[in-house]
């Protein structure tokens, strides 16, 4: 699998033999899903993200007066909870102080050419197969 990263390090395109997957870290460091499907080239599909004032959708503080930017309507890769996106959460967290907000924001990335395991989770190990992983690091408020 090939992993293509844009020069500014914010657009990621994963290519298999027959398919492509693309995601993008926007100017507020929210990692957005752009595309999954039939193989495409390396074009930037972030222009497909359509933001419009939905009236009922909340806006994050950093959007300022921009009523068109809402976590509730964006196709987030890793949606948090308690921060303005009222769809189903990917993860629910309760902190020791009883709060539950999880605001995931893109921080950095690395490309690994080997398999890795998360402690306590199942993993595959096969020396006959080459691995390429894109690991997006995100910071989360209150975590």
Where do the language-model regions lie?
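Acidic, proline/serine/threonine- and glycine-rich low-complexity intrinsically disordered segments
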Residues: 128-129
């Amino acid at each position: 699998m090939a992993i293509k990263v844009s020069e500014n390090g914010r657009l990621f395109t994963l290519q298999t033999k027959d398919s492509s997957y693309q995601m993008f870290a926007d100017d507020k460091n929210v990692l957005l899903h752009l595309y999954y499907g039939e193989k495409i080239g390396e074009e930037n599909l972030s222009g497909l993200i359509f933001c419009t004032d939905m009236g009922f959708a909340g806006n994050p503080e950093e959007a300022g007066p921009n009523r068109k930017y809402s976590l509730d309507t964006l196709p987030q890769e890793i949606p948090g909870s308690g921060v303005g996106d009222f769809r189903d959460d990917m993860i629910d967290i309760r902190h020791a102080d009883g709060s539950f907000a999880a605001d995931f924001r893109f921080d950095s990335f690395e490309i690994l050419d080997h398999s890795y395991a998360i402690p306590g989770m199942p993993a595959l190990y096969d020396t006959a197969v080459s691995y390429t992983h894109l690991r997006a690091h995100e910071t989360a408020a209150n975590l």
